[in-house]
Design a protein with these regions (language model features):
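P-loop NTPase motor core
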Residues: 2-120
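Active-site-adjacent bridging/hinge elements
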Residues: 34-43, 134-140, 167-177
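Glycine- and acidic
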Residues: 47-53, 142-151, 177-190
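Charge-rich, solvent-exposed alpha-helical interaction surfaces
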Residues: 66, 86, 103, 125, ...
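Long, low-complexity, polar/charged, intrinsically disordered or flexibly structured peripheral segments
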Residues: 108-159
Length: 195
């Protein structure tokens, strides 16, 4: 993951840990590593069992739900409540996410990213801020808040479209790589979880 993202550690990029000391002797392998490091990439590294919901494995969409959660978290959106992440994504697309966060903190005296996990207790502030920003009417914001606590379903196709849209906005041959640990144990013998 460090190499794909070409992360910097102690002032040195990941690829330099391999090139500076001449650790890689095969020029083809080294060229492939440099190519991978030069491609702008978001790497999402996670243990699926620790990110999955305790009751979520019964659903045939359990795996895509976990991928959505970590994808949302990688962007700084709410991972635990996909409806909130959808709102944050829409606000971000419209250039209003920072404004929303500032106004929410003014209205509630709590930073949005801390308060969003207690969404059930903050709905009035969310409605007020969304309507004051003229992002939604009061009625639409209340309706959205009611739906935001309902079960969330996403298809694999819809998730793939979200990732594709994200990549296209990043441009310049940007990649997103999901590196999943413990997937075999997570699926086990459950045929519903197999793709």
């Amino acid at each position: 993951s460090y190499l794909l993202a070409n992360k910097e550690v102690d002032g040195k990029t990941a690829i330099r840990y391999f090139t500076d000391d001449g650790k890689i002797k095969d020029n083809v392998v080294l060229a492939d590593m440099k190519l991978a490091a030069d491609i702008p990439t978001d790497v999402v590294l996670f243990n699926i069992d620790s990110k999955g919901e305790m009751t979520g494995k019964q659903s045939k969409d359990a795996i895509v739900s976990v991928f959505l959660k970590v994808f949302n978290e990688m962007q700084g959106f709410c991972g635990s409540m996909p409806f909130l992440a959808d709102l944050e994504r829409k606000l971000s697309e419209e250039g209003l996410y920072d404004t929303f966060q500032s106004r929410f903190e003014e209205a509630s005296s709590s930073p949005w990213k801390e308060a969003r996990n207690e969404f059930d207790f903050n709905q009035d502030d969310v409605v007020k801020v969304l309507s004051d920003m003229e992002f939604m009417s009061v009625e639409a914001a209340r309706n959205w808040c009611e739906k935001a606590t309902e079960p969330y379903a996403i298809s694999i196709e819809r998730f793939a479209q979200l990732v594709k849209t994200y990549i296209e906005k990043k441009g310049k041959n940007h990649h997103v790589v999901f590196l999943v640990d413990e997937i075999g144990q997570y699926i086990g013998d459950d045929s519903k979880l197999m793709l």
